[in-house]
């Protein structure tokens, strides 16, 4: 027997049930028991965050920098700013601006933003306090910690951005290729 007149040979779209707070999906796709729907987060997942390589008050880990920061914090800040800005802000410019703000008591407003950028770049916690508080209350300690952190990540703030780039290029050129064998 044939089809009744007026019906086509097209398949009807099937309705799929989705899990929502108001309905439950069973293993066979129908409404019923709740299904084990993955959320994308493993059961034993713990979000980890990198830690600062040194504590806030570990200034004597780099005593030379500690003395420079105590005498002329604008120098340390300028070095940090040049590295964090990837050379866009020269050390002297950042240092002079910091120095001018230092005498008004507002240098922390400028400097804490660089701490926040360092934290973001290296995935560091906002510790021991929010960046602006750390810079307001413990400015020289914060600058020393940031300087040490940059060194920990392979930067030499004394060289500036261009010096670090040049040093990295020289090291790259001197690194022997891996995975090659001698033929012969």
Curated annotation (Swiss-Prot):
GO cellular component, one term: membrane
NCBIfam families per record: A_thal_Cys_rich
PANTHER family: DUF614 FAMILY PROTEIN-RELATED
Transmembrane segments: 94-114
Biased composition regions of type Polar residues, renumbered to the chain: 1-26
Location of the protein in the cell: Membrane
Superkingdom to which the source organism belongs: Eukaryota
Membrane topology type: Single-pass membrane protein
Name this polypeptide is given: Protein PLANT CADMIUM RESISTANCE 5
Region (Disordered): 1-33
UniProtKB keywords: Membrane, Transmembrane, Transmembrane helix
Pfam families: PLAC8
Family: Belongs to the cornifelin family.
Source lineage: Eukaryota, Viridiplantae, Streptophyta, Embryophyta, Tracheophyta
Function: May be involved in heavy metals transport.
């Amino acid at each position: 027997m044939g089809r009744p007149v007026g019906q086509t040979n097209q398949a009807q779209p099937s309705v799929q049930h989705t899990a929502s707070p108001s309905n439950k999906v069973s293993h066979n796709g129908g409404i019923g028991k709740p299904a084990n729907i993955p959320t994308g987060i493993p059961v034993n997942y713990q979000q980890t965050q990198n830690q600062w390589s040194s504590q806030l008050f570990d200034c004597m880990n780099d005593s030379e920098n500690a003395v420079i920061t105590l005498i002329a914090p604008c120098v340390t800040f300028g070095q940090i700013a040049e590295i964090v800005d990837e050379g866009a802000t020269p050390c002297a410019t950042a240092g002079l601006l910091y120095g001018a703000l230092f005498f008004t008591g507002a240098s922390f407003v400028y400097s804490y933003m660089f701490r926040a950028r360092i934290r973001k770049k290296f995935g560091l916690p906002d510790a021991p306090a929010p960046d602006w508080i750390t810079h307001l209350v413990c400015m020289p300690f914060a600058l020393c910690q940031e300087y040490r952190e940059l060194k920990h990540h392979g930067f030499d703030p004394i060289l500036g951005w261009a010096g670090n780039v040049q040093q990295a290029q020289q090291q790259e050129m001197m690194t022997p290729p891996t995975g090659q064998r001698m033929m012969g």
